[in-house]
Design a protein with these regions (language model features):
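Class I SAM-dependent methyltransferase Rossmann-like catalytic core
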Residues: 13-30
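Class I SAM-dependent methyltransferase SAM/SAH-binding core
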Residues: 49, 55-107
Length: 199
């Protein structure tokens, strides 16, 4: 029961690399189409970051959306996840558009300004959510957007609302995000007008 609780319920943990195959498969595209979720938030030519990129499900879509003039950084704490993501990017011909990097559990290591940050189904794995949100605020451009998506099964409403409140305390303006199957989402921006500036 303890192992099942760690995987399916609310304990803080890092999703093991092998578990990605249970939900990162062709059927997922039917209910969580990455381009449909991200379109309207990401522009061609932007620099974007996929935090907790796992096997690259969203990183590949981000690379297609930002195009040849854009840049994608996929971050994860597990080397095996990054290895899978690199192989997938190479098969799709996107390996030159995406830089996959190992990051530390308490530091993302981004030193350049970025236009968009995605944290999909991973903030609940972070031990210090406030420090994590503070760090994102340091490298997100004033006009940039941060899409935060959490799974309903791991993150009950009260805990998601606490994360949203922490985002506000970190200086973000928060608005409802796109509808994502089995998830709750918000779009965070450094300024109140940033969401309206996007196409």
């Amino acid at each position: 029961m303890s192992r099942l609780r760690k995987l399916f319920l609310m304990d803080e943990h890092t999703c093991p690399w092998w578990f990605v195959y249970t939900f990162d498969n062709p059927i997922r595209r039917l209910v969580q189409n990455p381009c449909a979720i991200l379109r309207g938030l990401v522009k061609e030519g932007q620099t974007v970051v996929d935090v907790g990129c796992g096997a690259g499900y969203f990183s590949l879509a981000l690379a297609e959306l930002v195009g040849a003039d854009g840049k994608v950084m996929g971050l994860d704490v597990q080397q095996r996840m990054l290895d899978i993501a690199r192989r997938r990017a190479k098969r799709r011909g996107l390996d030159r558009s995406i830089e996959f990097r190992m990051c530390e559990p308490d530091s993302l290591g981004i030193e350049e300004p970025v236009d968009f940050v995605l944290a999909f189904w991973m903030v609940h794995e972070v031990s210090d959510r406030k420090a994590f949100l503070d760090e994102i605020k340091t490298f997100l451009r004033p006009s940039g957007l941060f899409l935060l998506v959490e799974p309903k099964v791991h993150v009950p409403l009260h805990r998601f609302e606490k994360t949203v409140e922490l985002a506000r305390l970190s200086g973000f303006e928060v608005e409802p995000g796109p509808k994502v199957w089995f998830s709750r989402s918000v779009v965070c921006s450094a300024s109140a007008s940033a969401v309206g500036q996007q196409p």
